[in-house]
Curated annotation (Swiss-Prot):
GO molecular function: glyoxylate reductase (NADH) activity; glyoxylate reductase (NADPH) activity; hydroxypyruvate reductase [NAD(P)H] activity; NAD binding
Family the UniProt entry places it in: Belongs to the D-isomer specific 2-hydroxyacid dehydrogenase family. GyaR subfamily.
Gene3D superfamilies: NAD(P)-binding Rossmann-like Domain (3.40.50.720)
The protein's name in its UniProt record: Glyoxylate reductase
Complex formation: Homodimer.
Organism: Thermococcus onnurineus (strain NA1)
A Pfam family hit: 2-Hacid_dh_C
Subcellular location: Cytoplasm
GO CC field: cytosol
Length: 334
């Protein structure tokens, strides 16, 4: 009898097809996320679980799922999962790094460039008919934005995605600053990047890109005090997690001109956002689509399947997050 896996949202078919060869597969087909009540009911008889960032996987879920042995998170981040509790219960946790690195780095640049050059404002100006209404084809002061080439970028979080952003910055002839938990001398040498304490980085940078995981230490790390350190011409880009930024403080900074603009792909309480953000022209908003390319999402689906299949075969999953679990339980459904 095949082990049973529940996939809490429809993912690309390539991953589902791989899983069907080894598992009894149930997919939550609804466009809306699975409710907490339904999730707790459905996990009662599953051996494996494929989850999204929108699902909180904690002790309550583990207690409701006596057969559950592995959770494959369809994301790089895993702040939606209680890793300590999972390890204690002998549940393996995997994620999907690498395959979405370039797509997410590209998204940071989409937001950076769109904000710097006021692209969304300009698009609205054309679509609304205002350009035609004004009858002015071109004006020297129309939609002036900020130069990118040769400026200074500060990258907060210098893992795979942060480094990919830096490689793109090199092509723009930028000075590259970074902040992370540990220095990376080899990458500094490769990219000409400079390590800098966070507050100094904020003062020096024309563009600040946030790529850190959400932890107790990074919660609201960009607050009112730190926003005031930034240049009034600076632009903040957040592709990390919404709660890394104090949204109330950011709205105030954008409204009062402490910084020039912001590009946001993540929000504190998704799918909800601070209503005042919607009324500000100097912010570009996207609905958490950093990895939303065909290639990245298919790569994520394949990696999810590879992790589960490896576990079923008694092998350590390729992207195991909680390696301490190896001391609690061997891989496999036996």
């Amino acid at each position: 009898m095949k082990p049973k896996v529940l996939i809490t949202r429809k993912i690309p078919e390539n991953g589902i097809k791989m899983l069907r060869e080894h598992f009894e597969v149930e997919v939550w087909e609804d466009e809306h996320e699975i409710s907490r009540e339904v999730l707790l009911e459905k996990v009662r008889d599953v051996d494996a679980l494929v989850t999204m960032l929108s699902e909180r996987i904690d002790a309550e879920v583990f207690d409701a799922a006596p057969r559950l042995k592995i959770v494959a998170n369809y994301a790089v981040g895993y702040d939606n999962i209680d890793i300590e509790e999972a390890t204690k219960m002998g549940v393996y946790i995997t994620n999907t790094p690498d395959v979405l690195t370039n797509a997410t780095a590209d998204m940071a640049w989409v937001l950076l460039l769109a904000t710097a050059r006021r692209l969304i404002e300009a698009d609205k100006f054309v679509r609304s008919g205002e350009w035609k209404k004004r009858g002015v084809a071109w004006h020297p002061l129309m939609f002036l934005g900020y130069d990118v080439y040769g400026r200074t970028i500060g990258i907060v979080g210098f893992g795979r995605i942060g480094q990919a952003i830096a490689r793109r910055a090199k092509g723009f002839g930028m000075r590259i600053l970074y902040n992370s938990r540990t220095r990376k001398p080899e990458v500094e040498k490769e990219l000409g990047a400079e390590f800098m304490p966070l507050d100094e980085l904020l003062k020096e940078s024309d563009f600040v890109v946030l790529v850190v995981p959400l932890t107790k230490e990074t919660y609201h790390m960009i607050n009112e005090e730190r926003l005031k350190l930034m240049k009034p011409t600076a632009i903040l880009v957040n592709i990390a997690r919404g709660k890394v930024v104090d949204t109330e403080a950011l709205v105030k900074a954008l409204r009062e001109g402490w910084i020039a603009g912001a590009g946001l792909d993540v929000f504190e309480e998704e799918p909800y956002y601070h209503e005042e953000l919607f009324s500000l022209d100097n912010v570009v908003l996207a609905p958490h689509i950093g990895s939303a390319t065909y290639g990245a999402r298919e790569g994520m689906a394949e990696l999810v399947a590879r992790n589960l299949i490896a576990f079923k075969n008694g092998e350590v999953p390729p992207t195991l997050v909680n390696r301490e679990v190896l001391n609690v339980r061997k891989p496999g459904f036996e």
